[in-house]
Curated annotation (Swiss-Prot):
Its EC number is 1.3.1.93. It is an enzyme of class 1 (oxidoreductase). This is Very-long-chain enoyl-CoA reductase. It is a multi-pass membrane protein. It comes from Homo sapiens (Human). It is linked to Intellectual developmental disorder, autosomal recessive 14: A disorder characterized by significantly below average general intellectual functioning associated with impairments in adaptive behavior and manifested during the developmental period. InterPro entries: 3-oxo-5_a-steroid_4-DH_C, SRD5A/TECR, TECR-like_N, Ubiquitin-like_domsf. Glycosylated. PANTHER family: 3-OXO-5-ALPHA-STEROID 4-DEHYDROGENASE, VERY-LONG-CHAIN ENOYL-COA REDUCTASE. It catalyses: a very-long-chain 2,3-saturated fatty acyl-CoA + NADP(+) = a very-long-chain (2E)-enoyl-CoA + NADPH + H(+); octadecanoyl-CoA + NADP(+) = (2E)-octadecenoyl-CoA + NADPH + H(+); (2E,7Z,10Z,13Z,16Z)-docosapentaenoyl-CoA + NADPH + H(+) = (7Z,10Z,13Z,16Z)-docosatetraenoyl-CoA + NADP(+); (2E,7Z,10Z,13Z,16Z,19Z)-docosahexaenoyl-CoA + NADPH + H(+) = (7Z,10Z,13Z,16Z,19Z)-docosapentaenoyl-CoA + NADP(+). GO terms for molecular function: oxidoreductase activity; very-long-chain enoyl-CoA reductase activity; very-long-chain fatty acyl-CoA dehydrogenase activity. The modification Phosphoserine is found at S58. Involved in both the production of very long-chain fatty acids for sphingolipid synthesis and the degradation of the sphingosine moiety in sphingolipids through the sphingosine 1-phosphate metabolic pathway. Catalyzes the last of the four reactions of the long-chain fatty acids elongation cycle. This endoplasmic reticulum-bound enzymatic process, allows the addition of 2 carbons to the chain of long- and very long-chain fatty acids/VLCFAs per cycle. Pathway: Lipid metabolism; fatty acid biosynthesis; Lipid metabolism; sphingolipid metabolism.
Amino acid sequence: MKHYEVEILDAKTREKLCFLDKVEPHATIAEIKNLFTKTHPQWYPARQSLRLDPKGKSLKDEDVLQKLPVGTTATLYFRDLGAQISWVTVFLTEYAGPLFIYLLFYFRVPFIYGHKYDFTSSRHTVVHLACICHSFHYIKRLLETLFVHRFSHGTMPLRNIFKNCTYYWGFAAWMAYYINHPLYTPPTYGAQQVKLALAIFVICQLGNFSIHMALRDLRPAGSKTRKIPYPTKNPFTWLFLLVSCPNYTYEVGSWIGFAIMTQCLPVALFSLVGFTQMTIWAKGKHRSYLKEFRDYPPLRMPIIPFLL
């Protein structure tokens, strides 16, 4: 059985960083990364991007050496992705923050609204209902991160945790300040508006959870398998008939419901920014589905049925 020789060059300087002799033909890129780490321990596998061309796409960890368009002496180019952190850690951090930050404003801890309001309670029912909904949303997200989601990528750049936390924590503080303010004004149409908004919120939260469970069942634990998601017997998953990412559709719907319930401008802005970002993600995933699966359902749109 022939063996391969693998040289790894710096993608920027073309400097030879490592030479691997007698590499098995069936070795994966993940195994080559581990061998590279032995000579350069500062670059652990998650930091490494190996590619066939200095400006090309990163090879997948599961790619097999003998199936790549290389000879028995293969040249790979290395790029440092920077310090990495696990997706689970990032999600837990960015979701735990809003949960606790919101509660600080809800309980009106000292130095927020003035001494005479310390630890007082709002007289408006919608304020307490909003706290329950907000807390439920982020507790749900935390539990899904721990027990439901299966991540195709193990890590992301460390800098992302600061960007994500600034976004989630900042908006949580902004909306919580106004919703729990002693001078907060309840919704214009009173109980009817709150009940309608609560119904929207609850339905969308159930829908979002149902989609996450359906997506989880598509991917076996520990794998990166991708399949076309289809509706199940659960009615909340029937939205798969019309959109590629109904989890985002339901998520946006939840925040629209919360915005109607609280009639709070920061919540509306958070919903708008979230919708914009999720639309970008949904379009990317939709394109990926179309590219990977020739039999992908043609009627589906990325996030909004028939429109977007």
